[in-house]
Regions:
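Basic/hydrophobic alpha-helical interface regions
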Residues: 1-138
């Protein structure tokens, strides 16, 4: 899907334009680098934050098709990009926030998931996602 077929600017340009607003959703001061927009990624995730480098990554291969969805058409693609980026900023500001907290969350989840160690990362991330999305919904 191209910008001309949707009538909107390309996803990389939207992400660049929405990045300051995404950070402002949480705080006027963050130490995050501008998002890295990846045409190719070894990860299947839509987007993620690397707490070691304080950088957000967006998988354009996964994100671009979302621009043609009902959600993008009703809210507008810019708002969808804003929500995606603000969610990732939330991983920095709220949950987990840093590597030490991420490790503590993983330890708690591991103790609750008896004999399911392979699920710890996914469950910990889902818990953080719920906290972030709940907070974003309240804004």
């Amino acid at each position: 899907m191209t910008a001309s077929s949707t009538g909107h600017q390309p996803l990389p340009a939207m992400a660049e334009a929405m990045w300051p607003r995404a950070q402002l959703v949480w705080s006027p001061i963050t130490r995050l680098h501008r998002p890295t927009l990846l045409e190719k990624s070894s990860k299947d995730a839509l987007a993620w934050i690397d707490l070691r480098t304080m950088s957000v990554h967006v998988n354009l291969r996964r994100a671009t098709p979302l621009m043609g969805t009902t959600a993008a058409r009703s809210a507008g693609p810019e708002e969808l990009v804003l929500a995606l980026l603000a969610h990732e900023v939330g991983h920095y500001v709220l949950a987990p926030g840093d590597m030490a907290t991420a490790a503590r969350i993983h330890m708690r989840v591991r103790s609750a998931l008896i004999d399911c160690d392979e699920q710890v990362g996914m469950v910990a991330n889902l818990w953080c996602d719920l906290l972030i999305n709940d907070e974003l919904q309240r804004h």
